Each structure stands twice: as C-alpha cells, then as structure tokens.
C-alpha cells in the first residue's frame, strides 16, 4: 500500500498519522479503531481533543529529539478519561495514562544513520523483538507459549541502546 504512495520502509511521512487502537488484555495486540469508532466510544469532541493532544505530545517530543540527533519514527500515547472531573473546555478530563516517548513506547532512530528504503538502526525495543523472532530464540509466537528468557547479551545490547537514547536526548550520562 505505501509503496504505491511513493513510500519505502523508513520514509518520512509528510504529516503524523493518528492511528487509534483499543487497549487489549495483557499479552494480546491492541486492535485498530477507525476515527468513527473512537467518536462512538468517547464522543466527537473528546476524540478530537485526544487527537490534538497526541499530536502535540509528538510535536514536542520531535522538537527535543531532533535537536539531539534522534528521529521519533512512531510512538504510542495512551489516554484515559476521568468523567468525574472537567477540563478547561467543560468536557471530561483526558488523562495521560501511561509512559510517553520512551524506548518501550516509541521507535527512536539515529538521525545521522537514517536512510529510507531499509530497516533503520534503532534505540528501542525492536532489538528484542528481532531476537525473539529470529531462529536463535527458538520461539514460535504462534505456539501460544511464553517467550524464552532473554540471553544476557540481548539484555545488555538493549540496555546499551536505551542508555544511548537517554544520553543523546538529555545530554546526560547515568552512572
């Protein structure tokens, strides 16, 4: 589909895309929702505010990350609604409900290595996903079995990627 639109793996989109999903039970994948489905669940005005909030969070994250050599390829932002409280619009309070802009919820790419048309090096959990789906793990996701424990070298390589993302974005090192 994207190839027909002139996009390759790793292509920069002209504008961010808002792709809402349901919250699935632990161990299952969230299911995509249409904007109409979101509007049906939370109402048109709340759906529009969630869209704006998600885009603002990504825009601010992109400002900080790009100034520090990181591309945020995508991110997940989870919201909840507190119907017992109102926000400044008089509607229900929308609450940021989970981590935001971390290597677990986003794909961070080094800008100096970005090259459309190929898989990108990353500072996120993709390394773990790649190992789990490799023959080295011996795991078949379709088996219904829990994934195997991660080898120390996979844990260390993942930790190093997360630390590099932190250090690039913040300009600080951790002891």
Per-segment meaning from a language model:
Residues 1-2:
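Short, small-residue-biased leader/transition segments that mark boundaries at the very start
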Residues 10-44:
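A short mid-domain helix/strand-loop element embedded in enzyme catalytic domains
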Residues 41-73:
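A long amphipathic alpha-helix within ATP-dependent nucleotide-binding catalytic cores
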Residues 72-98:
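Conserved metal-phosphate-binding beta-hairpin within the catalytic cores
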Residues 100-165, 169:
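C-terminal helix-cap and adjacent tail motif
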Residues 173-175:
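Charged phosphate-binding loop/patch that engages nucleotide di/tri-phosphates or the phosphate backbone
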């Amino acid at each position: 589909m994207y190839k027909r639109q002139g996009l390759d793996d790793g292509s920069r989109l002209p504008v961010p895309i808002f792709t809402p999903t349901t919250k699935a039970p632990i161990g299952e994948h969230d299911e995509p929702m249409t904007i109409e489905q979101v509007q049906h669940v939370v109402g048109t005005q709340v759906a529009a505010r969630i869209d704006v909030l998600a885009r603002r969070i990504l825009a601010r994250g992109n400002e900080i990350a790009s100034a520090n050599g990181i591309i945020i390829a995508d991110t997940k932002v989870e919201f909840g609604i507190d119907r017992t409280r109102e926000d400044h619009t008089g509607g229900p309070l929308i609450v940021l409900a989970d981590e935001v802009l971390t290597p677990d919820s986003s794909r961070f790419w080094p800008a100096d290595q970005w090259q459309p048309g190929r898989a990108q090096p990353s500072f996120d959990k993709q390394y773990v996903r790649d190992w789990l789906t490799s023959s080295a793990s011996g795991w078949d996701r379709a088996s219904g079995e829990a994934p195997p424990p991660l080898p120390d070298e996979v844990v260390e390589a993942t930790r190093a990627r997360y630390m590099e993302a932190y250090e690039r974005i913040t300009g600080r090192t951790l002891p």
